Design a protein with these regions (language model features):
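Short, hinge-like loop/turn segments at secondary-structure boundaries
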Residues: 55-59, 104-107, 130
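Short, solvent-exposed amphipathic alpha-helices that sit
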Residues: 26, 62-74, 98
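Structural beta-alpha unit
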Residues: 1-2, 79-112, 157
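Small/aliphatic-rich secondary-structure junction motif
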Residues: 2-54, 136-139
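Acidic, proline/glycine-rich short linear motifs
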Residues: 42-69, 151-157
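Short, well-ordered secondary-structure micro-motifs
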Residues: 23, 50-53, 100-101, 124-125, ...
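General small-molecule cofactor/ligand-binding pocket signal
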Residues: 39-41, 87-91, 142-144
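Glycine-rich, Arg-bearing micro-motifs that act as flexible, cationic patches
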Residues: 111-136, 148-154
Length: 157
């Protein structure tokens, strides 16, 4: 930013779940209202590719193409919603580990935004990062409830 301060980025982990959309909207609205940015992280699970080398490479490329497509679709939605153009980050590995590695490697990421499921469990990523890491997280974590309406998300941002 021009005044010498770092831009705060909101990190969102992208997947195919409905709660991901709530987290995306929250991050985009907060970025819009604070002059920040959004980083969308898509993590491809490596255990999906435990096949013969040629087949594994083809599957890896297909997974990467699907990740790029998903991120592209969401980027269009975010830009239309609030004028935010997010950064993309596609990684392969354990989701929780990749989230932590990205946070450590990008000092501008200031908040991790996660979407919680509507059931009794908030979901595996929320459980893993918040319940197990808790006070050891290097940045604040915002958990957006799965049952929260889009209107309510907009109102609190």
């Amino acid at each position: 930013m021009e005044d010498g301060t770092e831009m705060r980025k909101f990190l969102v982990v992208v997947d195919e779940t409905p709660e991901c959309m709530n987290a995306m909207r929250f991050a985009a609205r907060r970025a819009q209202n604070t002059g920040g940015g959004v980083v969308m992280l898509y993590v491809i699970a490596p255990d999906d590719f435990q096949h013969w080398v040629g087949v594994a490479e083809l599957m890896r490329q297909e997974a990467r193409d699907a990740a790029e497509s998903r991120l592209g679709e969401l980027a269009v939605e975010l830009n239309a919603l609030c004028g935010v153009t997010p950064e993309f980050n596609i990684r392969e590995g354990n989701r929780a580990e990749q989230v932590l590695e990205l946070i450590e490697s990008d000092s501008e990421i200031g908040v991790l935004v996660l979407g919680a499921g509507e059931g009794e469990s908030p979901g595996p990523l929320v459980s893993q990062l918040v319940a197990k890491m808790g006070g050891r997280m290097p940045i604040p974590v915002t958990v957006v409830p799965g049952a929260m309406s889009l209107e309510r998300i907009d109102a609190v941002c």
